Amino acid sequence: MAVQAALLSTHPFVPFGFGGSPDGLGGAFGALDKGCCFEDDETGAPAGALLSGAEGGDVREATRDLLSFIDSASSNIKLALDKPGKSKRKVNHRKYLQKQIKRCSGLMGAAPPGPPSPSAADTPAKRPLAAPSAPTVAAPAHGKAAPRREASQAAAAASLQSRSLAALFDSLRHVPGGAEPAGGEVAAPAAGLGGAGTGGAGGDVAGPAGATAIPGARKVPLRARNLPPSFFTEPSRAGGGGCGPSGPDVSLGDLEKGAEAVEFFELLGPDYGAGTEAAVLLAAEPLDVFPAGASVLRGPPELEPGLFEPPPAVVGNLLYPEPWSVPGCSPTKKSPLTAPRGGLTLNEPLSPLYPAAADSPGGEDGRGHLASFAPFFPDCALPPPPPPHQVSYDYSAGYSRTAYSSLWRSDGVWEGAPGEEGAHRD
């Protein structure tokens, strides 16, 4: 109707609420200036003449397109608002929530033991009983039984997993299930826990015996096995005597409050109590600084320095004496050590590290070296001390006359230095 009105009218703006004649249009815009909306000719032609001359096919076509666009847009908007959109994904929220509730209740182990859940073993046994009564519906029933069987298998697997988790984290509650293997399994952990609660050696033996007595039982849960207490918690040293709950030094804050804490204390007491054999041995035997194999290499206790004493005599910033200050030792000679002036023996303490000036005249400390290191060579006897101003070359093979035989003449005169031609052999 709007398009027809636009075609019949003489002005394109008439269908939008104006009158059907140019006079009505002019009356509506009479208050406006003629130059504000329409451009006049130089000759001053009125606006009505321009409007009447502008009527043509272009204006009518544009008006028709505009009105058809508005009509289609309004209809599309109305349909979009009224028509409900289809969901691309269908979710059965009731079934999903039921699954979640069943799974959570199975994990928590709060469900009381009831009839055994249907499994894949009993579903084929039920189907042949119903097949003779309705043989004509056998094919459709078989087609519908496949998803039901898969659902029952999934439910059985979920119930088995929930039961195993409940048995793992709850040792005092029985494993739910009315089957005979489950009953045997419940009896075995009960016997193991009862024996372990005594705290003696009988509990350690009764646990495995009760677990292995039933051949048809399933795998024993981890908490029901006879495992040492150190498997679950880190062991700590005992704080007091006795094998009761107050024996081990374990705080109740680290464990659960209730029967499990008491059971843990009773299990931990015999192993880590202070009255056990290991604790008595540790308290009675002192700590040996040296290992057992090193006792063979040790000498008499008089010759060994103290544990925290300084090292032995260090003469001239050397731990070991010079080669010419140690006499050659004879392995067959074993005589008590006698010092001419020091008076040192094996059972007496060492003399001062640096002897007085009277003991070593002329700055020669040959005898002082021997006196300082005498206890470390018990098999060697000290030779008589040399004269004050004469050095002996017999202390070592490296400085003997045989090594420097070319410097001695046949008459025993030294040929070494120019000022020592008259020196005779000693």
Swiss-Prot record:
Compositional bias of kind Low complexity: 128-141
Source taxon at top rank: Eukaryota
Pfam family, one: TEADIR3
InterPro entries registered for this protein in UniProt: FAM181 (IPR029359), TEADIR3_omega_loop (IPR053819)
Region Disordered: start-end pairs: 106-157, 226-246
Family: Belongs to the FAM181 family.
PANTHER family the UniProt entry points to: PROTEIN FAM181B
This protein's name: Protein FAM181B
Species whose genome carries this gene: Homo sapiens
Gene that specifies this protein: FAM181B
